[in-house]
């Protein structure tokens, strides 16, 4: 398997874009391998410009829950393109997707479409602050909510720490209103509210953390957040940009039975096109302009192509789709445990719906500190060997793998065999 064309393309790209990429993880730095340039894809398969074929578990980092180039989605997109790409005015496609989102997401009575997950979380925080009249937000260590200034912060030391900037260019004055605590730690939340409760506007949380690998909530964690925010008059914000429609038919909140005040969506609701959304109770959402005075706007928000792709994607998902994901996940988990045991390599597997995370340590993995104990050198080796076997995994230990309705049981069996072959060359 060669990467000659990708290597040459990257040399050109590095003179055109920072690091040659438009999103850092695509540089493949953490796995010490050439960045791969993709050419086309269909179903569960993706092909690079060197002609290499892979079973794809990245799926554009989650959006493609139906697999690549779904016929119904592509057909309707062609029809939408022929009508025009953007109008700067409302379209019926916006109504259709909004109705479907409201129907399926328990917390959402009204929704505002945007063009990215970062936009959605940024707007949700502004709305939470405007609605409550408070300043501080709680987030969790290892949870990623986009690249807005107030969320790019470190945890520091201690149980509940006022944030310091985690990226140059983020003013300390901005970061100081973000409190970071360990994921799955209700005691830390209680301490934070005891110290700052009268100025905490809300908690933003991934109901299943997806950017430190896949880390589900402990029993009672999400319910505890709901109770504490209720007690203090703060808002509970679920960032379901990744988990939305991946963990369950009614998103993670439906799966776990905990209803937040606001929900952020993205990825799947665009079916592979740029999209985001935030929504919640009517009384909160009616504070957003033009009804209320909390401003948010976007030139391409609700554009007809993304709305069409999202509607056609969600329309094909049924409760049976999630039963299928469970079946595939069971086969993959059982197979991986057998293979890793055979080679005496420790593995911890975490799952939630169509999201699967594996950590090369003894486990358990319930927070960012435990995720960081994974064997990153072995992960890097394994990534390279799996690519040779025709399996495209996320090039980072701290990203989850994704299943689609296009994946077959044969794909899963081939993947398990690929892990066996890869490990036999490494250990």
UniProtKB/Swiss-Prot annotation:
It is found in: Cytoplasm. GO terms for molecular function: glutamate-1-semialdehyde 2,1-aminomutase activity; pyridoxal phosphate binding; transaminase activity. Keywords: Cytoplasm, Isomerase, Porphyrin biosynthesis, Pyridoxal phosphate. The modification N6-(pyridoxal phosphate)lysine is found at residue 267. It comes from the Bacteria. It is an enzyme of class 5 (isomerase). InterPro entries: 4pyrrol_synth_GluAld_NH2Trfase, Aminotrans_3, Aminotrans_3_PPA_site, PyrdxlP-dep_Trfase, PyrdxlP-dep_Trfase_major, PyrdxlP-dep_Trfase_small. Its EC number is 5.4.3.8. It holds the Pfam family Aminotran_3. GO terms for biological process: protoporphyrinogen IX biosynthetic process. Its cofactor is pyridoxal 5'-phosphate. Pathway: Porphyrin-containing compound metabolism; protoporphyrin-IX biosynthesis; 5-aminolevulinate from L-glutamyl-tRNA(Glu): step 2/2. The keyword DNA-binding does not apply. It catalyses: (S)-4-amino-5-oxopentanoate = 5-aminolevulinate. One of its GO terms (cellular component) is cytoplasm. NCBIfam families: hemL, PRK00062.1. Belongs to the class-III pyridoxal-phosphate-dependent aminotransferase family. HemL subfamily. Homodimer. This is Glutamate-1-semialdehyde 2,1-aminomutase 2. It comes from Staphylococcus haemolyticus (strain JCSC1435).
């Amino acid at each position: 398997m060669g990467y000659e064309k990708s290597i040459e393309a990257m040399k050109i790209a590095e003179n055109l874009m920072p690091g040659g990429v438009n999103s850092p993880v695509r540089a493949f730095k953490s796995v010490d391998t050439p960045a791969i340039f993709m050419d086309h894809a269909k179903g569960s398969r993706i092909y690079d410009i060197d002609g290499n074929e892979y079973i794809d578990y990245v799926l554009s980092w989650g959006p493609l829950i139906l697999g690549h180039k779904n016929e119904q989605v592509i057909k309707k997109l062609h029809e939408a393109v022929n009508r025009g790409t953007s109008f700067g005015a409302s379209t019926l496609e916006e109504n259709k997707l909004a109705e479907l989102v409201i129907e399926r997401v328990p917390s959402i009575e009204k929704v505002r479409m945007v063009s990215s997950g970062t936009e959605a979380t940024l707007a949700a925080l502004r709305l939470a602050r405007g609605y409550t009249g408070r300043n501080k937000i709680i987030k969790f260590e290892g949870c990623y909510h986009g690249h807005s200034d107030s969320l790019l912060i470190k945890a520091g030391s201690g149980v509940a720490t006022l944030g310091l900037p985690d990226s140059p260019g983020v003013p300390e004055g901005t970061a100081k209103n973000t409190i970071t605590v360990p994921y799955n730690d209700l005691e830390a939340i209680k301490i934070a509210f005891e110290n700052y409760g009268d100025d905490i506007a809300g908690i933003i949380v991934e109901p299943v953390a997806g950017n430190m690998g896949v880390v589900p909530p402990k029993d009672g964690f999400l319910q505890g957040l709901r109770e504490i925010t209720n007690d203090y008059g703060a808002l509970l914000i679920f960032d379901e940009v990744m988990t939305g429609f991946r963990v369950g038919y009614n998103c993670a909140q439906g799966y776990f039975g905990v209803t937040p005040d606001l929900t952020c969506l993205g990825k799947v609701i665009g079916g592979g096109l740029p999209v985001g959304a935030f929504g919640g109770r009517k009384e909160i959402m009616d504070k957003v302009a033009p009804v209320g005075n909390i401003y948010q706007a976007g030139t391409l928000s609700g554009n007809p192509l993304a709305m069409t792709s999202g509607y056609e994607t969600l329309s094909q998902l049924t409760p049976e789709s999630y039963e299928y994901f469970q079946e595939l996940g069971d086969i993959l988990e059982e197979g991986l445990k057998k293979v890793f045991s055979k080679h005496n390599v420790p593995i911890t597997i975490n799952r939630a719906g169509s999201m699967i995370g594996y950590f090369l340590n003894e486990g358990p993995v319930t927070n960012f500190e435990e995720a960081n104990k994974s064997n990153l050198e072995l992960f890097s080796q394994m990534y390279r060997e799996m690519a040779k076997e025709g399996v495209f995994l996320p090039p980072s230990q701290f990203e989850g793998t994704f299943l689609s309705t296009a994946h077959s049981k044969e794909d899963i069996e081939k993947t398990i065999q690929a892990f066996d072959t890869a490990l036999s060359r490494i250990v």
